[in-house]
Amino acid sequence: MSDQFKAIVLNQEGDNFSREVKSLDRSFLKHGDVTVQVEYSDLNFKDGMILKNGGRLVKEYPHIPGIDFSGKVIESENSKFKSGDEVILTGFRVGEVFFGGYSQIAKVNADFLVKKPDNLSSKQAMILGTAGLTSLMSAFAIQARESILLGEKVNDVLVTGATGGVGSVAIIALTKLGYNVTAVSGKESKSDYLKSLGAKNIINRAEFDKDPRPIDKGLWDGVVDTVGGKILANAIAQTKPNGIISVCGNANSNELNTNLLPFMLRGIKVWGMDSANCSIKRREFTVSYTHLRAHETHND
């Protein structure tokens, strides 16, 4: 195989930020013990920030972005993998601190890789990507509420930022688990799309993007929040007793103005979802959970 490959390369000199496709030599790849022929990658919110100006996430240049990829191992210095193994990578700060997947060839730590299940194609793995992993972890967190409460049924689940990657896959997964999903979105033109994913109801974002009450009428057994800010604060105020909230995004704001009443009077639980650094065992479990996969319902 040729030692030459192409990649998107970011550079910054002073105030000048640039991005271009370059031909590189494999010696350019600095880190890792497994070399992968990249077949697919995807585009996440974080990728967009990095491609725009580094997003304050990239510390060293030149840099190859792309936080996710799937492909085949072509060379391994680690006994965990051999040539020909099909693998998936999401997170672990690849594409930020380490060179990423917007490249024909990637070289990464073996501990960052998951073997691709046989019944999931390389393309389907990137249809899911980080967004899919995060949303499935969120769905499992809400499902776990039933186990924690000895079978107390989850019925009504709210998904914010519903037209985004995490929100869209969360709707599919939660619907397949049998929950009644309500989607929050500011995009009225996407109502048919959200219903096609399984959302039973759609609420305009403006209903949530306002100052919250300390505690409100309990409406939701579970919440998947991808946006933060006032929208999350209102969702917390509206969560039913013993409800669980998966916090997995900050598209609206990093801020959260809430109070103790929903926690003390209703016993609600907030579960932060860090899919970027979760264990390999947890990743392997999630990608093997075939009946919740997005591509079975929605392949766009």
Where are these regions (language model features)?
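Rossmann-fold NAD(P)-binding glycine/threonine-rich loop
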Residues: 253-265
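Adenosine-nucleotide cofactor-binding segment
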Residues: 175-231
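Helix-to-beta-strand junctions that scaffold the AdoMet/dcAdoMet cofactor pocket
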Residues: 239-240
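Glycine-centered, small-residue-biased loops immediately flanking beta-strands
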Residues: 243
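NAD(P)H dinucleotide-binding glycine-rich loop of Rossmann-like/cofactor-binding domains
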Residues: 90-157
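Glycine-rich beta-strand-centered segment in the early N-terminal region that forms part
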Residues: 27-42, 54-94
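Glycine-rich NAD(P) Rossmann-fold beta1-alpha1 loop
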Residues: 161-168
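Conserved small/polar residues in nucleotide/adenosyl-binding loops
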Residues: 290-297
